[in-house]
Amino acid sequence: MSDSREIKKPWWFKKAKEWADEFYTRDQKLEDSDRRDLSKKYATISKASVVGAATGLSAGLGGPYAYRYYTTGALKGVKLPRTILLGVVSMVIMRNVAAKIAWDKELKKLDPSGELKQNYKSAHKTVDDVSLSDNSTSVQKKYGMMKFLKYRTAPRWAMYFEGTYQHPDRKFPNPDQMVQDLKGSRRAFPPFFSKADKFWHQIDRKDNDHT
């Protein structure tokens, strides 16, 4: 029977912690040369997303006017609010499409034969297992990291990997240590953080019960 005092950590906390743990593990295995290469790859993806966003915005804003002029010979009658909305939607869609295409191309450069991609789809052995092992190659580690991070926040990762290449001391910290630091500093919070303090207290008690 479980302890009635036990509290479940919020789903968002668990998800964030799981993501942080995996990223930290992958990040620690990267060499300086890996970081530089990943920075360049994500910079390329970032540039592609900017071009895609600009193309989508231009098409969304200019499309209705071009269609109106083609069908009526005049530009009057185009509803501006609808056109702006179409432009924004087109910008977001094309940004993601362009980033995805660039991301696929960069993965292909790492895996021209398709071997890593095939392993990644395997039900028994994934590229994640290989890229996280102590014997993983530079290509496997970079491929695994890019598969993990995806492409939607390319500018952030381009800056992160370049920054940690230049300054290794700025690497992502150990998530377990971050949690311990938060626990240690919780009593410095103002009174309106009392619920957060209660949450950390219950986590402390749960951890102590298992020791």
Swiss-Prot record:
Induction: Expression is inducible by fluconazole. Expression is positively regulated by the master transcriptional regulator PDR1 which probably binds the PDRE motifs TCCACGGA (positions -770 to -763) and TCCGTGGA (positions -740 to -733) of its promoter. It is found in: Mitochondrion membrane. Keywords: Membrane, Mitochondrion, Transmembrane, Transmembrane helix, Virulence. It is a multi-pass membrane protein. InterPro entries: Pup1-like (IPR012470). The chain crosses the membrane at residues 45-67, 82-99. It comes from the Eukaryota. Disruption phenotype: Leads to an increase in phagocytosis but does not influence binding to host macrophages in infected mice, when the pleiotropic ABC efflux transporter of multiple drugs CDR1 is also deleted. GO terms for cellular component: mitochondrial membrane; mitochondrion. Mitochondrial protein that contributes to the enhanced virulence of C.glabrata strains that acquired azole resistance. Belongs to the PUP1 family. This is PDR1 up-regulated protein 1. It comes from Candida glabrata (strain ATCC 2001 / BCRC 20586 / JCM 3761 / NBRC 0622 / NRRL Y-65 / CBS 138) (Yeast).
